[in-house]
Every structure is written in C-alpha cells, then in structure tokens.
Regions:
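Anionic-ligand anchoring segments at beta-strand to alpha-helix junctions in alpha/beta enzyme folds, i.e.
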Residues: 20-59, 72, 189, 196-274
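A short, small-residue-rich loop immediately preceding and capping a beta-strand
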Residues: 20-23, 43-46, 64-103, 210-213, ...
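Glycine-rich beta-alpha junction loops
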Residues: 27-29, 103, 161-167, 213-215, ...
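Short glycine/serine/threonine-rich phosphate/pyrophosphate-binding segments
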Residues: 30-32, 53-57, 77-86, 90, ...
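Conserved thiamine diphosphate
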Residues: 113-152, 270, 321, 325, ...
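Conformationally flexible catalytic loops at phosphate/diphosphate-handling active centers
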Residues: 148-203, 341-342
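Phosphate/diphosphate-binding loops
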Residues: 257-308, 316
C-alpha cells in the first residue's frame, strides 16, 4: 500500500474537500506543509502580513461564498494570533477550519520554543478543537473537521498538527464518509410544530417576521422573500439577518434593537405574534428582557437547540435549518390580513 507523509495527506484532503483558497502564513512548524502546497496549483494560497488578518479574510470568504474558510498558521504566536478571529466566527456561526502547527509530540508540555496549548486556549471559542496525536487518525480528523464546521450551526474548528505527526509516513487514503458518534445535527423541521406556528400566524392581527443570521447563513433569501410576499407580513432583521430580504422591499421595516430603526422597535413592541427565524435574541436586540415584545406570542425557529428559550421564553420552539423550515412554510402559508397593521407601521 502506498504511503505518504501527513503533509501530503493534508494537501490531498484539501483538494478532496473542494478547497479553492487557503489563507496561510508560514512558520517553522508548518514549513513542510507549505512546501507541499507550493508543488500544486489547485489550492491557491492567500498570504497576508499577519495571522489576525488571515483569519478575518477566511471569515469574510466563508460569509460571502457559503464555503468553509481554511487557515494555516504556525505554532505559538501564529496560533494565538487567531484568537479574535475564531471568537468572531464562533459568535457569528461562520464555518472555518484552522490548521495550526505544533511542536513535535515529545516536546509538548515541556515549554518548548513557540509551544502553546492552542486547543485549550480556544476551547470556549471553537465548535471543536483537537490535537492530532497519531498519524493514522489524521485523515479521519480532517474529514470530521470539515463536516463539523459546515453542518448544524456552523462554526470554527481548530486542528493542531504536531510537526513529527505530519512528517510520519502513513496511508494515502482519505475517508469518503464521516460518522461521528453523538453528533447528529437535526435539519428536518417538525411539521406538527410548524403547522401550529402557521395557525398562530393566520390568526394574528399584528404579525411580524424577525429574520436573523440563520436565514442568511442557510442561503434562504429567495424562499424567505416568497413567504413574506405571500403572507404580506412585515419584516424586521437583526444585524446578522440584514440582507435576508432587500432593504428597499416595501415589507421591510428595518433593523431591530439598540442600533436599529425606530419603526422596527415600535413594531416589535406592539406586535401580537413575533415569528423569529435564525436569531439568538441577544442583548443588542432585546434590551430589557421583560419588556421585549410584551404583547406577542413568540415562535422561534433555530438550528441550535441551545439558542431556543435561552434569553427569551418562546411559545412554539422549532429546531430546524432555517431554509428547510421556510421552504416547508411556503407550502402552507396564506395571505394574512395585515392592511391595518401595515398602515400603523407606516406612521412610525
């Protein structure tokens, strides 16, 4: 069986995962990976002048394309310079896979030159992080990293690569499938819960859609616009949800919250149904929790179970991918009687 180094397998894995661009800054612990990348043309290298710029560039790439942003940095300061970017991606649900160089395994824990426990440092700001301790685990871990980053609620994954593991020869095979015990993200919408929510929507006198980043991340712009136009229900957005519907659309009111539009905040304060999709209800939009949407029943669709009823208690929780839920909604919704409500909003 053909054997190749871990460095070669990493480059092969990037190609298999369809990576077009890698944002990287070389250093001693990743120089051999850089050499392998130099030998091929499929994965293009974006070289910044600082690792912090690099991770923000990868973040921007992921947001604009919907693909996983990929980073490569060396150990020590190279790795620690990722921290702010990782925290940003984690907070905003941006899929990244960040590879960090690490000293050889026998030096880990011995205060070696440019050795830091980057997995430990970033544990609370990454979706998943791991140090590859065995060459035979490398392919599986890379495959899992991309899967975890892009599925469920997207987020950053950090893979720490000891220099000796990457130099070691091993299998050239890269896994085709992934099966992670205990990690089975739910994407299918519960039809019963969705129909309950739509029933409330049809009965409401002053309904309002709240679109968060989940609508944008799931690329649900077009189908969401169809639902809005079919129901004639007005829309407010979070900062992350801006762009989920054109800002010049007649049913779009504006951003909600402390940096939002007066009309949007008044609409939330006076609505009798707040139909929220893909938002965390953080303090920037809620203000005082006990005063938020005081007259409304609340529907909350979100792919992350932990986000539902964490800040605001909701009446109908639905765990689902935003696009999946909105697509199903489009099959059942009908035009709502919102003429009087829209007239009131226009006065604000």
């Amino acid at each position: 069986m053909k054997q190749i180094s871990g460095n070669k397998l990493l480059v092969k894995a990037l190609k298999e995962e369809g990576v077009e661009y890698l944002f990287g800054y070389p250093g001693a612990c990743t120089i051999d990976i850089s050499d392998e990348l130099y030998k091929q043309d499929d994965v293009k290298i974006i070289l910044p002048r600082h690792e912090q710029a690099l991770v923000h560039e990868a973040d921007a790439y992921a947001r604009t394309t919907g693909k996983v942003g990929v980073c490569l940095v060396t150990s020590g300061p190279g790795a620690t310079n990722l921290v702010t970017g990782l925290a940003t991606a984690n907070y905003d649900s941006v899929p990244l896979v960040c590879f960090t160089g690490q000293v050889a395994r026998h030096l880990i824990g011995n205060d070696a030159f440019q050795e830091v426990d980057i997995v430990g440092i970033t544990r609370s700001i990454t979706k998943y992080g791991v140090t590859v301790r065995r060459r035979e685990d490398l392919g599986r871990i890379i495959k899992e990293a991309f899967y975890i980053a892009r599925t469920g609620r997207p987020g950053p994954v950090l893979i720490d690569l000891p220099k000796d593991v990457m130099a070691e020869l091993g299998s050239a095979e890269y896994p085709k499938n992934v099966n992670i015990r205990g990690y089975k993200p739910n994407t299918d919408v519960h039809i019963g819960q969705l129909k309950r929510a739509i029933k409330l929507l049809n009965k409401a006198k002053r309904p309002l859609f709240l679109a968060g980043g989940g609508v944008v991340i799931s690329r649900a712009h077009e189908i969401f616009r169809e639902v809005v136009e079919k129901t004639k229900v007005p829309v407010v957005t979070t900062v992350m949800g801006k762009g989920s519907i054109p800002t010049d659309h007649p049913l779009y009111i504006g951003n909600l919250g402390m940096h939002g539009a007066y009309a949007a905040n008044m609409a939330v304060s006076n609505c009798d149904l707040l139909f929220s999709i893909g938002t965390r209800f953080n303090d920037r939009i809620t203000g005082k929790l006990h005063e938020f949407a005081p007259h409304a029943q609340i529907v909350h669709i979100d792919i992350d179970t932990a986000s539902i009823s964490r800040n605001i208690q909701v009446d109908i929780p639905i765990v689902s991918d935003a696009k999946e839920a909105i697509t199903k909604m489009n099959e059942y919704v009908q035009e709502c009687s919102t003429g009087k409500w829209l007239g009131q909003i226009s006065q604000w």
